[in-house]
Amino acid sequence: MAIRTVSSLVRALYQTPKSQSFRIFSTLLHDPPSPDLVNEISRVLSDHRNPKDDLEHTLVAYSPRVSSNLVEQVLKRCKNLGFPAHRFFLWARRIPDFAHSLESYHILVEILGSSKQFALLWDFLIEAREYNYFEISSKVFWIVFRAYSRANLPSEACRAFNRMVEFGIKPCVDDLDQLLHSLCDKKHVNHAQEFFGKAKGFGIVPSAKTYSILVRGWARIRDASGARKVFDEMLERNCVVDLLAYNALLDALCKSGDVDGGYKMFQEMGNLGLKPDAYSFAIFIHAYCDAGDVHSAYKVLDRMKRYDLVPNVYTFNHIIKTLCKNEKVDDAYLLLDEMIQKGANPDTWTYNSIMAYHCDHCEVNRATKLLSRMDRTKCLPDRHTYNMVLKLLIRIGRFDRATEIWEGMSERKFYPTVATYTVMIHGLVRKKGKLEEACRYFEMMIDEGIPPYSTTVEMLRNRLVGWGQMDVVDVLAGKMERSSSCSVQDMAVEMRGKRRRLGRRSENSEDDDDDFELERDTI
């Protein structure tokens, strides 16, 4: 029944006059959208995730202010809201004298792909081809390749390549490279290698770059023999074997544990007149760091200095993370200073590696000082930074400092997600005398229209019932029932002690917080 409802809704939304022609220029492009308006419409989409929700009726009030620029910004903000974002896009297209930008079409393809709405994606592309809404270029298919690869559907990615001709596109070597790169990036290397073998039947001549992509793919899954076979085939076909190809094989050897073989390859590169670059040295640094051998990593770093080569931020981050794992946080700070001197500006991951050490060791003063240092260097904390610091502060009872950091989030352009709210609520619930404050954060989350995890609702309800505060349970449940978010409304029954018939929302249900782990025993 639900499938029929969704299908009929999509068909109704697609009913657009056939006479509408493609216009590549954005409507009202000169009028930048208000950030508040973008936030407001994004909130509406978030609150209307259910296919049965009357999203279009709610959007009517915004019609006079809709521009192609606004649509782009909303779509970028709502990349994790596949179905409502699609409905919003189709609704905007029906506004008189409105035309989407080419960028908006590409963003929507990416949204539908990342949310695994592949049936909708192909319907959208077929309809766009029929009515000539926008030019379906190779770049659109590159987005589709990446989406299928991320969804662990490598065979479908290959089928998408074969369907390019249906849309008037003759695949070329660049398209093949993009497909192979997408597959290898998600470790579907065997599928990539198999499809590569069939590519000759399409009349596509592989380039040196094509071979290098496959070699890097085998390196990614630590298979040096597979990488060597591709490399040897490259030589047999008289391809120009450049530094990129040698680095790829070097990476494969080192990642598979054959660092000695990698060093021999490194020497061979020099004999052939290939001058190693920073990445060539970085391969050894990463290999030594993975083995926990910081001393050898530093020796390679010193050798790079002699050649006036500077590692990139990613390589510095790898060393810093290894130093912290080896309890050498002071050396990590020295390397942090060296990064800045070399012009490799530390990023959030750099600071998070050190922050994780301080939080694991309950070094609250050093953690807060590091947060201040991030402010001075204009490096914005992310959700990992905040979650680590807030967990630490609540764990040791520094509630005043936790509140101060929470209130400063908006100044750092960070807006709490469900994971960050969960850190506060779960932590405070377990602290004596902080149940009321936990309820306050729960109410803030409900007011923001952010659906809580089922475990959060259950924990808070059980604690309130245990303290005989059923009146507070009723207040919270009533607030959830009145929420503008349909998802929050659905969860009100859990606050009232009943189980929903639909699947429960867990900590792993948010793509945005897929690597968030709730510390049940340490808060």
From Swiss-Prot:
<dbReference type="Pfam" id="PF13041">
    <property type="entry name" value="PPR_2"/>
</dbReference>
<feature type="repeat" description="PPR 10">
    <location>
        <begin position="417"/>
        <end position="452"/>
    </location>
</feature>
<feature type="repeat" description="PPR 6">
    <location>
        <begin position="277"/>
        <end position="311"/>
    </location>
</feature>
<feature type="repeat" description="PPR 1">
    <location>
        <begin position="101"/>
        <end position="135"/>
    </location>
</feature>
<dbReference type="Pfam" id="PF01535">
    <property type="entry name" value="PPR"/>
</dbReference>
<feature type="repeat" description="PPR 7">
    <location>
        <begin position="312"/>
        <end position="346"/>
    </location>
</feature>
<protein>
    <recommendedName>
        <fullName>Pentatricopeptide repeat-containing protein At1g52640, mitochondrial</fullName>
    </recommendedName>
</protein>
<feature type="repeat" description="PPR 2">
    <location>
        <begin position="137"/>
        <end position="171"/>
    </location>
</feature>
<keyword id="KW-0496">Mitochondrion</keyword>
<feature type="compositionally biased region" description="Acidic residues">
    <location>
        <begin position="509"/>
        <end position="523"/>
    </location>
</feature>
<feature type="repeat" description="PPR 3">
    <location>
        <begin position="172"/>
        <end position="206"/>
    </location>
</feature>
<dbReference type="InterPro" id="IPR002885">
    <property type="entry name" value="Pentatricopeptide_rpt"/>
</dbReference>
<feature type="repeat" description="PPR 5">
    <location>
        <begin position="242"/>
        <end position="276"/>
    </location>
</feature>
<feature type="repeat" description="PPR 8">
    <location>
        <begin position="347"/>
        <end position="381"/>
    </location>
</feature>
<feature type="repeat" description="PPR 4">
    <location>
        <begin position="207"/>
        <end position="241"/>
    </location>
</feature>
<feature type="repeat" description="PPR 9">
    <location>
        <begin position="382"/>
        <end position="416"/>
    </location>
</feature>
<keyword id="KW-0809">Transit peptide</keyword>
<feature type="region of interest" description="Disordered">
    <location>
        <begin position="498"/>
        <end position="523"/>
    </location>
</feature>
<dbReference type="GO" id="GO:0005739">
    <property type="term" value="C:mitochondrion"/>
</dbReference>
<keyword id="KW-0677">Repeat</keyword>
<feature type="transit peptide" description="Mitochondrion">
    <location>
        <begin position="1"/>
        <end position="5"/>
    </location>
</feature>
<dbReference type="InterPro" id="IPR011990">
    <property type="entry name" value="TPR-like_helical_dom_sf"/>
</dbReference>
<comment type="similarity">
    <text>Belongs to the PPR family. P subfamily.</text>
</comment>
